[in-house]
Amino acid sequence: MKLKTNIRHLHGSIRVPGDKSISHRSIIFGSLAEGETKVYDILRGEDVLSTMQVFRDLGVEIEDKDGVITIQGVGMAGLKAPQNALNMGNSGTSIRLISGVLAGADFEVEMFGDDSLSKRPMDRVTLPLKKMGVSISGQTERDLPPLRLKGTKNLRPIHYELPIASAQVKSALMFAALQAKGESVIIEKECTRNHTEDMLKQFGGHLSVDGKKITVQGPQKLTGQKVVVPGDISSAAFWLVAGLIVPNSRLVLQNVGINETRTGIIDVIRAMGGKLEITEIDPVAKSSTLTVESSDLKGTEIGGALIPRLIDELPIIALLATQAQGVTVIKDAEELKVKETDRIQVVADALNSMGADITPTADGMIIKGKSALHGARVNTFGDHRIGMMTAIAALLVADGEVELDRAEAINTSYPSFFDDLESLIHG
């Protein structure tokens, strides 16, 4: 598709879609709880719809009516063997978390996904689950999907140090630990997003968190709840950057989730000199209103414990860095290589084709700014975040056209993205 270019200003206020991580988990917890769960403001992107369909296939009654998702929970042991293989679509979150959920189910399942998911390594989750007594295997030594899994009613607790910082693996092991008899201890390499921990407590579960150490005593029962999903800061990130780099702009983003494990992008914007204001903070929902204005930016260094707090925002942060004076270094982000695409290479290739100066490294990028961007043809390779990054980059292009191939990938997390963009262009 042909993208909008040469935009002189952006103005307006929008409410970004519901948080993808919280939306996935609300369906999982609601299904495993006893009683009814109602979920408000859920993200209806393709990944979350995949999770919803998988639990329907596992025998859970889920109704989507009048904007509210109602889940009739079946309890920790109530899932039923599906008639067919479970389709995870493009969703790494779905296949990894649900592997942990099914660890205690006494039936065999096959889980598969699209071409992109079929290239993503699952050994990070299959190895610890095998230690707990689960029979699980995929293709090649990296256990690529499709996966075959047979759970066990005699799940063993685990003491496991994560070799990588991964909220998905941590969460999969927590779901398994809830079904194992005894104490499981999970030790993170770096602190990652803690939505599973927060929601476990909300649904009446128990755990203790001491720094990077999480202890779960199993088995446990959960009770249905009301969940209100805040806006997704990973989706808001595209507008935060757009408001900072498009001249004469001021954008107001309402109801954005600001869980402290997800706000790395706010730290980076401030380090780069961006004008960003946080107001209307709701400490219970962990949400707020974020306002940004066009800013003169400077390069910075991004690495270490900051990376898990902004891993999904790094593509759009790379674009931000192309518009900052000086050098920005992103390091310790090798995890980007096993996202929907190799995001280190794909981001560098896409933005360099538009005139940026980015050198990919083994664990990140070196970005020299400030760069004037020009027209190009960019392929998302099925990666939603590459698509949205390119659409924001195109706004700065004064010379030539920007063509985006496979733009439909954006529906993974933000089906209304282009509608919201139009409203801000005309705001």
From Swiss-Prot:
<feature type="binding site">
    <location>
        <position position="385"/>
    </location>
    <ligand>
        <name>phosphoenolpyruvate</name>
    </ligand>
</feature>
<comment type="pathway">
    <text>Metabolic intermediate biosynthesis; chorismate biosynthesis; chorismate from D-erythrose 4-phosphate and phosphoenolpyruvate: step 6/7.</text>
</comment>
<dbReference type="GO" id="GO:0008652">
    <property type="term" value="P:amino acid biosynthetic process"/>
</dbReference>
<dbReference type="GO" id="GO:0005737">
    <property type="term" value="C:cytoplasm"/>
</dbReference>
<feature type="binding site">
    <location>
        <position position="168"/>
    </location>
    <ligand>
        <name>3-phosphoshikimate</name>
    </ligand>
</feature>
<dbReference type="GO" id="GO:0009073">
    <property type="term" value="P:aromatic amino acid family biosynthetic process"/>
</dbReference>
<feature type="binding site">
    <location>
        <position position="312"/>
    </location>
    <ligand>
        <name>3-phosphoshikimate</name>
    </ligand>
</feature>
<feature type="binding site">
    <location>
        <position position="20"/>
    </location>
    <ligand>
        <name>phosphoenolpyruvate</name>
    </ligand>
</feature>
<dbReference type="InterPro" id="IPR023193">
    <property type="entry name" value="EPSP_synthase_CS"/>
</dbReference>
<feature type="binding site">
    <location>
        <position position="20"/>
    </location>
    <ligand>
        <name>3-phosphoshikimate</name>
    </ligand>
</feature>
<comment type="function">
    <text>Catalyzes the transfer of the enolpyruvyl moiety of phosphoenolpyruvate (PEP) to the 5-hydroxyl of shikimate-3-phosphate (S3P) to produce enolpyruvyl shikimate-3-phosphate and inorganic phosphate.</text>
</comment>
<feature type="binding site">
    <location>
        <position position="25"/>
    </location>
    <ligand>
        <name>3-phosphoshikimate</name>
    </ligand>
</feature>
<keyword id="KW-0057">Aromatic amino acid biosynthesis</keyword>
<feature type="binding site">
    <location>
        <position position="120"/>
    </location>
    <ligand>
        <name>phosphoenolpyruvate</name>
    </ligand>
</feature>
<feature type="binding site">
    <location>
        <position position="343"/>
    </location>
    <ligand>
        <name>phosphoenolpyruvate</name>
    </ligand>
</feature>
<comment type="subunit">
    <text>Monomer.</text>
</comment>
<dbReference type="GO" id="GO:0009423">
    <property type="term" value="P:chorismate biosynthetic process"/>
</dbReference>
<feature type="binding site">
    <location>
        <position position="92"/>
    </location>
    <ligand>
        <name>phosphoenolpyruvate</name>
    </ligand>
</feature>
<dbReference type="GO" id="GO:0003866">
    <property type="term" value="F:3-phosphoshikimate 1-carboxyvinyltransferase activity"/>
</dbReference>
<keyword id="KW-0028">Amino-acid biosynthesis</keyword>
<protein>
    <recommendedName>
        <fullName>3-phosphoshikimate 1-carboxyvinyltransferase</fullName>
        <ecNumber>2.5.1.19</ecNumber>
    </recommendedName>
</protein>
<keyword id="KW-0808">Transferase</keyword>
<dbReference type="InterPro" id="IPR013792">
    <property type="entry name" value="RNA3'P_cycl/enolpyr_Trfase_a/b"/>
</dbReference>
<comment type="similarity">
    <text>Belongs to the EPSP synthase family.</text>
</comment>
<feature type="binding site">
    <location>
        <position position="21"/>
    </location>
    <ligand>
        <name>3-phosphoshikimate</name>
    </ligand>
</feature>
<feature type="binding site">
    <location>
        <position position="339"/>
    </location>
    <ligand>
        <name>3-phosphoshikimate</name>
    </ligand>
</feature>
<dbReference type="InterPro" id="IPR036968">
    <property type="entry name" value="Enolpyruvate_Tfrase_sf"/>
</dbReference>
<dbReference type="InterPro" id="IPR006264">
    <property type="entry name" value="EPSP_synthase"/>
</dbReference>
<keyword id="KW-0963">Cytoplasm</keyword>
<dbReference type="Pfam" id="PF00275">
    <property type="entry name" value="EPSP_synthase"/>
</dbReference>
<dbReference type="InterPro" id="IPR001986">
    <property type="entry name" value="Enolpyruvate_Tfrase_dom"/>
</dbReference>
<feature type="binding site">
    <location>
        <position position="168"/>
    </location>
    <ligand>
        <name>phosphoenolpyruvate</name>
    </ligand>
</feature>
<feature type="binding site">
    <location>
        <position position="166"/>
    </location>
    <ligand>
        <name>3-phosphoshikimate</name>
    </ligand>
</feature>
<feature type="active site" description="Proton acceptor">
    <location>
        <position position="312"/>
    </location>
</feature>
